């Protein structure tokens, strides 16, 4: 493709993805960088917008460029840029907060009410040839870390953030409900942080088999447990812990029965982190939360230092993200990539779309 073109993967409307030409972005802020996007992972949120046109309060009202799990190469820098240079390979943190909110000043910029997050309406995403980013939301990829691995840093950062929230350390016994990309990486980070037991729970045997590449010490298939069988599910998981409860439970599925079972699996005084996005409302045993004096913590994306730490985990070999990638597509086949993810959800873990040539 021409250096003077900027092809983009655009969600025109629900169920309609097209490749169209967008203007090549021009650096106007001296602290910004122009990037050539090299690899982008498909996220569940992209699929949700494609199928239904909205997530919560974020509704697709106009065509939007998809993608937010990306890596790229610096091709131009603003006059004030000092952290990166032309030619650097980087992972791109896709959410940029305001520089003035209380949340940002507190170091919790992921909670900034003015966050501009890629591929969250009305903000365009990263599935383009050229993309602009502030320099302080880029993390350089060390030699030996590929662009594909760099694209996996985004979901890995969620795993880093959730483990920090939970305080996982050496000896922690962990259960992860949901062995999708974020669940697998959350468990892998737990092992890297020192957890001695990491049990994955999912409905697909192939995903549980893959969990062994992400630090699983044991797995449990939950496909037979309906919503009213949460206690039975919790009992089954606890047997794998010698009849004990878990110190930390990460709920990464968003499924009602798993949320309920996660509470029941958490020990007295333990911690449950709700990582997965489920329905707006769900039923769970709140009396048990109080009676156990357990911590129930929400988790939203990632914040200061999480991207940096995620890159370091990959670069040092403490977390191997390569087994996460199950499918790869060329840029011009992006629409096929999304349709394939929908049609083969049980076998797909992470799909990578390469940048345009």
Curated annotation (Swiss-Prot):
Enzyme class: oxidoreductase
InterPro entries according to UniProt: ADH-like_C, ADH-like_N, ADH_Zn_CS, GroES-like_sf, NAD(P)-bd_dom_sf, PKS_ER, SDH-like
Cofactor: Zn(2+)
Enzyme Commission number(s) from the entry: 1.1.1.-, 1.1.1.9
Domain of life of the organism encoding this protein: Eukaryota
Entry-linked SUPFAM superfamilies: GroES-like, NAD(P)-binding Rossmann-fold domains
Catalytic reaction annotation: keto-D-fructose + NADH + H(+) = D-sorbitol + NAD(+); xylitol + NAD(+) = D-xylulose + NADH + H(+)
Binding-site residues, NAD(+): 202, 207, 275-277, 299-301
Keyword annotations from UniProtKB, A to Z: Metal-binding, NAD, Oxidoreductase, Zinc
The keyword Signal is annotated on this UniProt entry: no
GO biological processes: hexose metabolic process; sorbitol catabolic process
Gene Ontology terms, MF aspect: D-xylulose reductase activity; L-iditol 2-dehydrogenase (NAD+) activity; zinc ion binding
Induction: Induced by sorbitol.
Keyword Membrane: no
Binding sites annotated in the UniProt record for Zn(2+): 43, 68-69
Pfam families: ADH_N, ADH_zinc_N
Cofactor note: Binds 1 zinc ion per subunit.
Chain sites annotated for binding substrate: 49, 154, 301-302
Protein task: Polyol dehydrogenase that catalyzes the reversible NAD(+)-dependent oxidation of various sugar alcohols. Is active with D-sorbitol (D-glucitol) and xylitol as substrates, leading to the C2-oxidized product D-fructose and D-xylulose, respectively. Is likely involved in the utilization of D-sorbitol as a sole carbon source for growth. Has no activity on mannitol and primary alcohols such as ethanol.
Family: Belongs to the zinc-containing alcohol dehydrogenase family.
Subunit structure: Homotetramer.
Protein name: Sorbitol dehydrogenase 1
Organism listed in the record: Saccharomyces cerevisiae (strain ATCC 204508 / S288c)
């Amino acid at each position: 493709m021409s250096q003077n073109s900027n092809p983009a993967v655009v969600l025109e409307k629900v169920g309609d993805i097209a490749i169209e030409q967008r203007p090549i972005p021009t650096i106007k802020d001296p602290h910004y960088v122009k990037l050539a996007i090299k690899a982008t992972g498909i996220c569940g949120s992209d699929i949700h917008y494609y199928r239904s046109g909205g997530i919560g309060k974020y509704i697709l009202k106009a065509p939007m460029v998809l993608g937010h799990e990306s890596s790229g190469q610096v091709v131009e820098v603003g006059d004030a840029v000092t952290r990166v240079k032309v030619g650097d390979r980087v992972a791109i943190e896709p959410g940029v907060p305001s520089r003035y909110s209380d949340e940002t000043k507190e170091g919790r910029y992921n909670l900034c009410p003015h966050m501009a997050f890629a591929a969250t309406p009305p903000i365009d995403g990263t599935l383009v040839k050229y993309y602009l980013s502030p320099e302080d939301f880029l993390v350089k990829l060390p030699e030996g870390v590929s662009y594909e691995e760099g694209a996996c840093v985004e979901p890995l950062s969620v795993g880093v953030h959730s483990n920090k929230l939970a305080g996982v350390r050496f000896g922690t016994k962990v259960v992860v409900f949901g062995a999708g990309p974020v669940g697998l990486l959350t468990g892998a980070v737990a092992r890297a942080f020192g957890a001695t037991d990491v049990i994955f729970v999912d409905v697909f045997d192939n995903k549980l088999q893959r969990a062994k590449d992400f630090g699983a010490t044991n797995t449990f298939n939950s496909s037979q447990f309906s919503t009213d069988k949460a206690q039975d599910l919790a009992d089954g998981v606890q047997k794998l812990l010698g009849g004990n409860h878990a110190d930390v439970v990460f709920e990464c599925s968003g499924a009602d029965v798993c949320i309920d079972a996660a509470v029941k699996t958490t020990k007295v005084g333990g911690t449950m982190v709700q990582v997965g996005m489920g329905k707006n409302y769900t039923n769970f045993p709140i009396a048990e939360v109080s009676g156990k004096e357990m911590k129930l913590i929400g988790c939203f994306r990632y914040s200061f230092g999480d991207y940096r730490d995620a890159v370091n985990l990959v670069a040092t070999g403490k977390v191997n993200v390569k087994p996460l990638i199950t499918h790869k597509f060329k840029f011009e086949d992006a629409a096929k990539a999304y349709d394939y993810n929908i049609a083969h959800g049980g076998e797909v873990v992470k799909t990578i779309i390469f940048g345009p040539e």
